[in-house]
Amino acid sequence: WDPNKGPLPQPLIDDDVRFVSETLGLAADRLIPSLHLLSPTTATQRLGQGDLQAGDGFAAMRQQIADDDGLTLLECAGSLQEGLLYGLSLPQLAEGLDAGVLLVHLWQDSCSVDALLAAKQTLGNRLVGVVLNAVTPGEVESLERQVVPALENLGLPVFGVMPRSPLLRSVTVGELVRRLNARVICCEERQELLVETLSIGAMNVNSAMEFFRRRRNMAVVTGADRTDIQFAALEASTQCLILTGAGEPLPQLISRAEELDVPLLKVDHDTLATVEVIEQAFGHVRLHEAVKATYAFRLVEEHCRLDRLFSALNLPVHVA
């Protein structure tokens, strides 16, 4: 948020909250506005105020939840510490709302169990359980067989082991256009295409062709002067071709991209800076595309024990 562009919109409804509400068919009055926006600007303002209390907004939210006899879902920050500056860290919210906590934990390897043990120590009985997320697909079975029982023995109920999905991690071409401030040279109407992987065309063309054949749904970043790489990328599973540096694409390249319906983007950044921006985009997964939401529902149904979760939350919900 840039204060020079005006005040924050009110109510402050997160885009993900809006999408979920539309997907589930919830009325607008069922949405709970965010209390604060986490950003360097607001953090600086908060530091200057020297106030670490949640404030009246939290009290109003707590009353709103108390007045509703249904199920309320709150997404908290990504760590136990985030939000302390606002009095809204995960432990503070759980305590203030008398709420149970389900942790969706980014699984790396067994060393990442330390974070789960720390959460259990901090949250105590408020920690209902965990879901292990973004697990390498080939490791799901071994985790369910070995790691899950071990965690259960440590008092950490595991309600699911979710495999990593390139589709869910994907971003649209339009999102890359926005983040890169790119100029769309052709196929502007194809910005809804999903990019699952990133490839950098900095090798010789023979190596590039072999590499491209092993990838799918790529964004290929290469220099504007590497016409050999550019044409090779168009013949592979490429969702968009991103040209960096000085120079313009050849007319023949534009024509071929139009024939294949591959968006051609031109950016002012160098290759390294462009790759960094794209990797940041992959790190902020959004489910605002219907195909991703549908796939996410299917993954949850297949890999999560919702019956156990509902039982732990004392919810009278039947899962078929």
Placement of each model-derived feature along the sequence:
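Non-catalytic interface/targeting segments
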Residues: L156, V161-G223, Q280-A320
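Phosphate-binding/switch loop-helix module in NTP-utilizing enzymes
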Residues: T44-Y86, P91-G96
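Generic beta-sheet signal
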Residues: G70-L74, V101, M218-T222
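N-terminal phosphate/diphosphate-binding loop that engages ATP/GTP or pyrophosphate donors
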Residues: W1-Q53, Q64, A150
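Glycine-rich beta-alpha junction loops
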Residues: W1-D2, A134-T136, P163-L168
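Flexible, charged surface loops at secondary-structure boundaries
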Residues: I65-D68, M209-M218, A233-S237
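Conserved catalytic-core segment of NTP-binding enzymes
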Residues: C76-F159, D225-H288
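Short, basic, helix/turn surface patches
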Residues: S21-D29, N125-V135, V184-L194, H269-I278, ...
